[in-house]
């Protein structure tokens, strides 16, 4: 929207007003984890460790590549998108273990 000029004629005719910028809707935040949730999940992962299928995924990634790991993850998780995210997470865990 263009800025009004305060003149009664022309393309931008009309009274000058400051436009209000509304706060973003709270529903836009859905799905984004809060700091507390991130902390609790990392704490649980640290204490409980990996589940058996996650250990198998790591083993498959290290040995036979990611395709088989993705297929196993899809079978366990139900959707290919979640499977890709899980395999990526396991890759990050492997990379972190190499660094330390």
Swiss-Prot record:
Q: Name one GO molecular function term.
A: structural constituent of ribosome
What is the official name of this protein in its record?
Large ribosomal subunit protein eL36A
Kindly provide the PTM information from the record.
Answer: N-terminally acetylated by acetyltransferase NatA.
Q: Which InterPro entries match?
A: Ribosomal_eL36, Ribosomal_eL36_sf
**Where is it located?**
Cytoplasm
Q: Where are the transmembrane segments?
A: none
Which terms are listed as keywords in the entry? Acetylation, Cytoplasm, Ribonucleoprotein, Ribosomal protein
Question: What family does the Swiss-Prot or TrEMBL record give for this protein?
Answer: Belongs to the eukaryotic ribosomal protein eL36 family.
What does the further note read?
A: Present with 31600 molecules/cell in log phase SD medium. There are 2 genes for eL36 in yeast.
Where in the sequence is N-acetylthreonine found?
Answer: 2
Disulfide bonds, paired cysteine numbers: none
Q: Where is the signal peptide?
A: none
One GO term under biological process is: cytoplasmic translation
Report the Gene3D superfamilies cross-referenced here: 60S ribosomal protein L36
């Amino acid at each position: 929207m263009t800025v009004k000029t305060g003149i009664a004629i022309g393309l931008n005719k009309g009274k000058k007003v400051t436009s209000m910028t509304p706060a973003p809707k709270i529903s836009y935040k859905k799905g984004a984890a809060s700091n507390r949730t991130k902390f609790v999940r990392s704490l649980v992962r640290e204490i409980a460790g990996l589940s058996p299928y996650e250990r198998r995924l790591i083993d498959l990634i290290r040995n036979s590549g990611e395709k088989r790991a993705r297929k196993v993850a899809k079978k366990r998780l139900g959707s290919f998108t979640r499977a890709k995210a899980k395999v990526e997470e396991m890759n990050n865990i492997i990379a972190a273990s190499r660094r330390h």
